[in-house]
Each structure stands twice: as structure tokens, then as C-alpha cells.
């Protein structure tokens, strides 16, 4: 009998606008006894998987950015950069987007716990 190995994905995208809205909606459903917490965890795990796969397969756009590196750190195979006075420029576009401060979190492209 074959057993299916559970794949794990980074939970980074739960901190995006969409992830926060999903988490809030699930919390409301749990509070109102509409779903149980185990189902909410399965939904969030599915969200993590789908967002990671979609970004990897569908998004091909590139951008350039330039700014002043304020601080950086490397912990548990995750790089974190805080950049101030940053300018973004999308490929093929003449428009520049500016921000006072941006936090970039970079993880290994390999799935956690795998060598692939």
C-alpha cells in the first residue's frame, strides 16, 4: 500500500492582503461554529500550496529595484532584507514606483525538507 507524503510549503503568503483576508474569514467561520479548526488548517495549507505553485508556473514578469540597504539577516535558510528609498521598474515599462521602505523575504526555491 502506497502512502502519500505530505508536502509542506512556506507560509509566507499568509501575510499578504489575500492571505490575511482568508485567515480573518476562516476565524469568523470558526468563531460562529460554521467550520472546525482542522478544516481551516487544511484550507490554509491548500492556500500555501496553490499560491506557491501559481507564482512558480504562471508569473514570468521581471522587475528591477534600487535602494539603500538598511539591514539584512539570514536565519533558517531565509534571507530578510529591509531596503529604504527604493525604486521599482517593471520590464518593458517606463514607469517607476517609489517606496520609503520595503521588506523582502527570500526563501530557497526548493521545498522545505526536500533535496529536489
UniProtKB/Swiss-Prot annotation:
Disulfide bonds listed in the record: none
GO cellular component, one term: transcription factor TFIIA complex
Keyword tags: Nucleus, Transcription, Transcription regulation
Location of the protein in the cell: Nucleus
Keyword field contains Transcription: yes
GO molecular function: RNA polymerase II core promoter sequence-specific DNA binding; TBP-class protein binding
Gene3D superfamilies tied to this protein: Transcription factor IIA (TFIIA), beta-barrel domain, Transcription factor IIA gamma subunit, alpha-helical domain
Any one GO biological process: RNA polymerase II preinitiation complex assembly
Subunit architecture: TFIIA is a heterodimer composed of the large TOA1 and the small TOA2 subunits.
UniProt family annotation: Belongs to the TFIIA subunit 2 family.
Biological role stated in the UniProt entry: TFIIA is a component of the transcription machinery of RNA polymerase II and plays an important role in transcriptional activation. TFIIA in a complex with tbp mediates transcriptional activity.
PANTHER family cross-referenced by the UniProt entry: TRANSCRIPTION INITIATION FACTOR IIA SUBUNIT 2 (PTHR10966)
Name of the protein: Transcription initiation factor IIA subunit 2
Species name: Pyricularia oryzae (strain 70-15 / ATCC MYA-4617 / FGSC 8958) (Rice blast fungus)
